[in-house]
Swiss-Prot record:
Its main location: cytoplasm. This is Autophagy-related protein 17. It comes from Candida albicans (strain SC5314 / ATCC MYA-2876) (Yeast). GO terms for molecular function: molecular adaptor activity; protein kinase activator activity. It is a peripheral membrane protein. Belongs to the ATG17 family. One of its GO terms (cellular component) is phagophore assembly site membrane. One of its GO terms (biological process) is DNA damage response. The keyword Lyase does not apply. The lineage of its organism: Eukaryota, Fungi, Dikarya, Ascomycota, Saccharomycotina.
Amino acid sequence: MTNEINSATVTQDEVIKWSREAQSTLEKTQKICTDAQSSMQKTAQELTILIPDKLQAIEFLFKSYREQYDSILKQIETTKIYLHTNIDKVFNDIKDLLDPSLARLNNILLELKKTRVPSIVVEGTSEGKTLFDFTSIQSINLLKENIGIFKSNCSKIKNLLDLEVKEKLNIEQDRMNSRWNKSVKMYDLIAPLQLELRALIHGASNESNSFMGTILRENQALENELVSILEMQTNHFDQCMKAVELISSGNGCDMNLGVLKNDAQELPEVFKELTTIYDIILRNEERSKKFLATHMPNIEKISDIVKEELAVFRKFKTEEIPRYTFLIAECENKLKECSMPVKSDQSPSQVYTQTLQELTEHYVKFINIYKTKYLAELHHQQFTYPRKFLKKLTEFLNEDIYRIQIEESERRRQWTSRYGEFIPSEFKLPGEHELPVIVQIITEGLEYIQKEDGQEEEPNIGNEKELMDMITGSNK
């Protein structure tokens, strides 16, 4: 009964119209579905392939950047430590050891210049002589000249290393630190994106509340709806074609044309729903593009900075570090050059310092012995003992003469043995061979205490007074 009503109320033209509308709508639906599928694939590729690949690449680059940054900083610090330990020590030794020792020697030489040597001390000399005139001044000047050359070379080397190594290392270190801090700040900007991607990778997209997860989840649901609508419209088109065939053959009663009519009437609404879904898919694609436009510049900028820094690092490690190393080695060899023999465990500063200290010690002893020992001994030998000898002689060659000669000879020998090395050879010091002796009852060595007529000279006048004044002045 129903089929008869349907067949009677639905004409062949209506069914043909439905089929044409179904075909047209299906064709448009297929095109929209194709475009929608392309849009979703593009969005999925951007969110699941492009961004992950970019992030993976920048993570690899940044890891390499961090390793190279740490490595070069360590090299710079190692170079600075080496300079401080092996090079700066040379300059510190000059300041702490060599310069003070040189100053002490100059002070003692100045004291030698102030210490007068009377004519009685050295025969055939004029007044105005000082102890300084009896030093190895040429050797001392040569030593000081060599020390001056050494210090001048060290100063030039220090300026060279400060300018060409230390300053440039500090500049490079500051530049590296500045670029590193800038890169870290930029890298931190993509940290949320990295976390979002990790959450997306380790969890299903339909469970992620992140932007990318939401987009992918929405597109998956929309894709399912598109498939459902496409299947429904395809089925409706098939039913329409079947209805046309049945009605044309007079078998229209075999179909429920009422349902087909309702489907045909709902077709515009279904297509509208399809276009709405497609609009959402396009909006998701646009959102994805904006998302990329927000993050990709940072990723690209970080990538460019890191690549640029890695290139700078490579050049620094292959060109600058070897150049610094070679320059330091050359300077270190120059700093070891010395005009005197140097042991393996000594530096030129230590050798020069030791020599200066030995000279200073020698001349300190020289002055002290001259003032406290030599002048008194000279007075004894030229005035005190001759008077004693003459006194004994006047006692008609008392047997004590022989004894005091022996005593005096031994005393002079001991004195010469103890202090003689500090007395210049030009200085007058009779010694054992000028002991007063009796030669045919003619006295010798008493000229300082006797007048030409053989009478005793008045004490504390002439040479003796000068000598006594110097002894007295030395003891003050």
